Amino acid sequence: MNNNVFHFPVLLDAICKLIEDLPVKSDLIYIDSTLGEGAHAKAILEKYDFLSLVGIERDSQILERAKQFLLIFKDRITYFNDWFDNFFANYPLNVKANFILVDLGISMFHYKDSKKGFSFLEDEPLDMRLCSSSCSISAAEIVNTFSKYDLESLIYNLSNEHYSRRISKAIVEYRKIKKIQTTKELQSIINKVYPFSKVKINPATKTFQALRIYVNDELARLKRSLPLWVENLAKDGILAIITFHSIEDRIVKDFFRSLSCDLYVKISKKPIIPSSDEIKKNKPSRSAKLRAVKKI
């Protein structure tokens, strides 16, 4: 396994500013709901010695990487190998959190080194399960068994892919001849039916996004977690959520809007986005949006 940490901590300066706005800076609890390789956690723990970290990560493989990466801070960290919605539904701590961070992006490790088929840049088995024991269906099973209508609905509803009908038809026609097993196979099917005059990103990008979201139940997990996150904030505590596509950002935006003004206040009216300098250094950050709310 490649032990280099791939993940660049997106919107780190904005996150640090939120932490600096906490009124008390002594013995505070910081929960990283999506620990990943620990890039955000390392930068935050280095800068703020008054924080203790609770790190939540469902993928046991990437959690072990994070533990090694954060070894110097081991006395300040408690780890949980779990989905964040399960953790907060059965909240195990005897104190509320002062700062909760949620980064909904997929780690670079999963794209570059997991061999689970999250990326079409390498030819890998079409799996996409972050946790095979709790995710019942793989991406390969979806593209090989779902009806044309169900594929079209899945791809459109989870990625806003305008050519979902064309793509789903091509998938169904292809699998009549041969089972779809790898990322490159699926990418090739999509590329052949996509109008290249319309291409701004790789034609397969949105379909892969939709499959990943479905396989890992990402949107339902987010919706379940939102009320649990705010419920488990301490007074003056802050919940910060980084989204990477319009569907999940809308869910977060609408939830924050629904909160009582007597109990919570939005940190900013509009989402915080990366600077041009950050995007130059880390191209995947270009679609990131940070929304935050404070419990009063």
UniProtKB/Swiss-Prot annotation:
Residues binding S-adenosyl-L-methionine: 38-40, 57, 88, 103, 110
Localization in the cell: Cytoplasm
GO CC annotation: cytoplasm
Alphabetically ordered keywords of this record: Cytoplasm, Methyltransferase, rRNA processing, S-adenosyl-L-methionine, Transferase
Gene3D superfamilies the record matches: Putative methyltransferase TM0872, insert domain, Vaccinia Virus protein VP39
GO molecular function: rRNA (cytosine-N4-)-methyltransferase activity
Pfam families: Methyltransf_5
EC top class, as a word: transferase
Reaction(s) this enzyme catalyzes, per UniProt: cytidine(1402) in 16S rRNA + S-adenosyl-L-methionine = N(4)-methylcytidine(1402) in 16S rRNA + S-adenosyl-L-homocysteine + H(+)
EC number: 2.1.1.199
InterPro entries from the UniProt entry: RsmH (IPR002903), SAM-dep_MeTrfase_MraW_recog (IPR023397), SAM-dependent_MTases_sf (IPR029063)
Biological process (GO), any one: rRNA base methylation
NCBIfam families to which the protein is assigned, alphabetical: 16S rRNA (cytosine(1402)-N(4))-methyltransferase RsmH
Family: Belongs to the methyltransferase superfamily. RsmH family.
Main function: Specifically methylates the N4 position of cytidine in position 1402 (C1402) of 16S rRNA.
Protein name in UniProt: Ribosomal RNA small subunit methyltransferase H
Record lineage: Bacteria, Pseudomonadati, Spirochaetota, Spirochaetia, Spirochaetales
Name of encoding gene: rsmH
